[in-house]
Amino acid sequence: AFAGVLADADIKAALAGCAAADSFNYKTFFKSPEEVKKFFAIIDQDHSGFIEEEELKLFLQTFSAGARALSDAETK
């Protein structure tokens, strides 16, 4: 889903940077408003125009099936 948006090395680095529970910080994860728009379209799985909490919790798994789910604290 992220082909053409991020290189494989960037994906691995991003996942490694937030592997620990409660370590995800969207401010450091997305680099530009354009990137946010691209990711929003990918994360909004049901194309509702909103990112539901469940979609957000599973966001890292969009990169890699083995990635952790975000915690409640990280999605608030």
UniProtKB/Swiss-Prot annotation:
What Pfam families is this protein classified in? EF-hand_1
Q: Which GO terms describe its molecular function?
A: calcium ion binding
InterPro entries documented for this protein: EF-hand-dom_pair, EF_Hand_1_Ca_BS, EF_hand_dom, Parvalbumin
Which keywords does this Swiss-Prot/TrEMBL entry list?
Answer: Acetylation, Allergen, Calcium, Metal-binding, Muscle protein
GO cellular component terms, semicolon-separated: cytoplasm
SUPFAM superfamilies to which the protein is assigned, alphabetical: EF-hand
Statement: the UniProt record of this protein carries the keyword Acetylation? yes
Residue ranges annotated for the EF-hand domain, each copy included: 31-66
Q: Which residues carry this modification: N-acetylalanine?
A: A1
UniProt-annotated binding residues for Ca(2+): D44, D46, S48, F50, E52, E55
The entry's other comment says: Is regarded as an important allergen.
Q: What does this protein do?
A: In muscle, parvalbumin is thought to be involved in relaxation after contraction. It binds two calcium ions.
**Family named by the database record:** Belongs to the parvalbumin family.
What name appears for this protein in its UniProt entry?
A: Parvalbumin beta 3
Taxonomically, what lineage is the organism? Eukaryota, Metazoa, Chordata, Craniata, Vertebrata
